[in-house]
Amino acid sequence: MSSKTVARSGTRTSRSKATSRGASRSARSAVPRKRSRPVKGVGRPSRRHHRSLLVSTGLACGRAMRAVWMMAAKGTGGAARSIGRARDIEPGHRRDGIALVLLGLAVVVAASSWFDAARPLGAWVDALLRTFIGSAVVMLPLVAAAVAVVLMRTSPNPDSRPRLILGASLIGLSFLGLCHLWAGSPEAPESRLRAAGFIGFAIGGPLSDGLTAWIAAPLLFIGALFGLLLLAGITIREVPDAMRAMFGTRLLPREYADDFEDFADFDGDDADTVEVARQDFSDGYYDEVPLCSDDGPPAWPSAEVPQDDTATIPEASAGRGSGRRGRRKDTQVLDRIVEGPYTLPSLDLLISGDPPKKRSAANTHMAGAIGEVLTQFKVDAAVTGCTRGPTVTRYEVELGPGVKVEKITALQRNIAYAVATESVRMLAPIPGKSAVGIEVPNTDREMVRLADVLTARETRRDHHPLVIGLGKDIEGDFISANLAKMPHLLVAGSTGSGKSSFVNSMLVSLLTRATPEEVRMILIDPKMVELTPYEGIPHLITPIITQPKKAAAALAWLVDEMEQRYQDMQASRVRHIDDFNDKVRSGAITAPLGSQREYRPYPYVVAIVDELADLMMTAPRDVEDAIVRITQKARAAGIHLVLATQRPSVDVVTGLIKTNVPSRLAFATSSLTDSRVILDQAGAEKLIGMGDGLFLPMGASKPLRLQGAYVSDEEIHAVVTACKEQAEPEYTEGVTTAKPTAERTDVDPDIGDDMDVFLQAVELVVSSQFGSTSMLQRKLRVGFAKAGRLMDLMETRGIVGPSEGSKAREVLVKPDELAGTLAAIRGDGGE
């Protein structure tokens, strides 16, 4: 303890000594500061003040020079970064800039070499160029101007760029070598200036020295010829055909044979009619049509929509000459002709769309971003091409040897992050290609007009009245479909996805292609406002139905119509309604003797339900049973259903409905579950809305992505007005009338010992006009189960409507009909 105390005291002593020494130093240092305080009138402080002023001035100048230097450095760096970002300029602007630079150089070179007018800089440029290419400098302005014009008048084609550069280089080098040989192969520098310069000497000199000029000249000529073939993009074997096509010497029958390859037995001279290939739904009535004269005006507007509207990185493979031949065939496509006084509305009433957009700098940036993601995750794959569609661009990724497809699909979220979008959809693989497709939305979407779809070549070639325009796919092809081949369609999509626009496009397509004698419609619109513009069109069987109960009755009437058609086809021994109509027109079949009926061709019937969910909530059993019966066997009878819904849940789109409706069209859905309900697979939840959809026709394994066609309210009004001006609707009686109650027994009608209680319940409900189970419990003093059974018995006899959840049931019997209803019930009970 004593040692510790001594150590502590020693430590305190040393600290105190150090403190005293520090204090003495501070005291000594404080004394001189007091002595060095400046005194007025003494010269020594003034010299120090003069030196401090010089130092301050120097420091200020240094700071100013540093600021100027930093500003210059920042300006230079900003300019360099701006120049580096020049690659983000649109390809068209970049090509125009290069072309204008070439024109400027052509002017300078022409002034210096032709007129000796651009001194002193022009003399230096002329001397430099003559050193390299000699007297060929006089042709350089013409070549530069020609290249500039080509750049300004053509679109970029990255695939052909190496071929063009190599071809131009071969032509230029061979020409300089020939010029050197023509000038006598001079070796002196002064003589080379008047020949082909240093380049001509380097090309032609070794050839002439080693092989003589007589052999060198043909070799150089062959090199120039090969360069010319590269520029033209043809081979030697194709030269004769190219010359014939250039000078118009191709034989006309061969050209027409190419143009009319889809028609049968056409000789190009004296054919007045052509017969379109019979489809499986055709009855021969729409097959034979007169051939339009070549001199006559086209039936549709002459505005052509380019077919080749895709751009790729590099461009996706396409048939050569497809655009030229496609345009030539469009002029020969025959339009549909109908019989009778009714005239189809002209497609001039519809608005044509803008030309398709080409590849932009954004597509190049997206391809680079996808490639960087693959590189960062060390996946042996590369972006080999892209195809731009109206809504999305599909980038094709080819995998290296031994790379699993799952490595690409697992990077979906990383690729979405790289391209700064959520709606990235992968297609592994692309149908018909050994590549994985990555679909990325375009920042500049294009609108697909219904007029362009209906005037497309493939749509006009199909003369069936049930052909509807769908839209345009990623490849840039217009997509149409035949309802007779579907034969029923299920459409689903959330709010704003484009479902209502599709229904409008489908109806306008039918109105512009079919007469009321060919197609009749039943429009069911529980939302009351979607199909209002079509009220009064002559194609309607009954006025537009807005009440769910009447809709269920209309579907039941459609079942009866289907059964009647099958009975007629059975009696006529035909299997399809088209065959029946064909025989009726030809007089091959007539009504049986003694019958009051008269056989007439049956029109196609298209029933469109705009919101299936409302019907399924009101009368699920009746609606589902009718839909299932129609979809199971109505195809041969010419009856087709189009079911649309915003809520594709399992209680709306039931298993029986899905099984019997093979064709599906899904727009953007709110969840993966909805996508699987409508398509039986994922994908619809990745769509971006506004007409972006997936079409899964009957028999297809993978859906086709397309942009739905758009038709405006003004176009709808114009087409509907044109239809109303020609005919009035002829409504059929009894379509929305419900069947007698005796036929609508879904619950066991045996009342048993509860007759008195049941009569009291009926009297109570009818007199109060309030169908509530809880009211029966209170008034009759029965349990919930018995009150519910009484309500079900009243529903089977048509006294109350179906259950609507927690709401009271609708009472269908009026108080003044109570006596007759009670008498009918007593009669039932007595049986």
Curated annotation (Swiss-Prot):
What are this entry's molecular-function GO terms?
A: ATP binding; DNA binding; DNA translocase activity
Output the SMART domains linked to this UniProt entry.
Ftsk_gamma
- Protein location: Cell membrane
Compositional bias, Low complexity, is annotated for 7-30
Record-linked InterPro entries: FtsK/SpoIIIE/SftA (IPR050206), FtsK_4TM (IPR025199), FtsK_alpha (IPR041027), FtsK_dom (IPR002543), Ftsk_gamma (IPR018541), P-loop_NTPase (IPR027417), WH-like_DNA-bd_sf (IPR036388), WH_DNA-bd_sf (IPR036390)
Question: Taking every annotated instance into account, which residue ranges of this chain make up the domain FtsK?
Answer: 476-676
Q: Is Transmembrane given among the entry's keywords?
A: yes
Which GO cellular component term is one of those annotated?
cytosol
This protein's membrane topology, according to the annotation, is:
Multi-pass membrane protein
**CDD domains linked to this entry:** TrwB_TraG_TraD_VirD4
Cytoplasmic-side stretches of the chain, per the record, are 235-831
The transmembrane residues are: 98-118, 132-152, 164-184, 214-234
Q: Where does ATP bind?
A: 496-501
Arranged from A to Z, the UniProt key words for this protein are:
ATP-binding, Cell cycle, Cell division, Cell membrane, Chromosome partition, DNA-binding, Membrane, Nucleotide-binding, Transmembrane, Transmembrane helix
Query: Does the record bear Transmembrane helix in its keywords?
Result: yes
Instruction: Offer one example of a GO biological process linked to this entry.
Output: chromosome segregation
Q: Where is this region: Disordered?
A: 1-48, 296-331
Q: What does this protein do?
A: Essential cell division protein that coordinates cell division and chromosome segregation. The N-terminus is involved in assembly of the cell-division machinery. The C-terminus functions as a DNA motor that moves dsDNA in an ATP-dependent manner towards the dif recombination site, which is located within the replication terminus region. Required for activation of the Xer recombinase, allowing activation of chromosome unlinking by recombination.
Q: What else is known?
A: Was identified as a high-confidence drug target.
Q: Could you describe the subunit structure of this protein?
A: Homohexamer. Forms a ring that surrounds DNA.
- Which family does the record assign? Belongs to the FtsK/SpoIIIE/SftA family.
What does the UniProt entry state concerning the protein's domains? Consists of an N-terminal domain, which is sufficient for the localization to the septal ring and is required for cell division, followed by a linker domain, and a C-terminal domain, which forms the translocation motor involved in chromosome segregation. The C-terminal domain can be further subdivided into alpha, beta and gamma subdomains. The alpha and beta subdomains form the DNA pump, and the gamma subdomain is a regulatory subdomain.
Q: What is this protein called?
A: DNA translocase FtsK
What organism does the UniProt record list as the source? Mycobacterium tuberculosis (strain ATCC 25618 / H37Rv)
Taxonomic lineage: Bacteria, Bacillati, Actinomycetota, Actinomycetes, Mycobacteriales
Q: Which gene encodes it?
A: ftsK
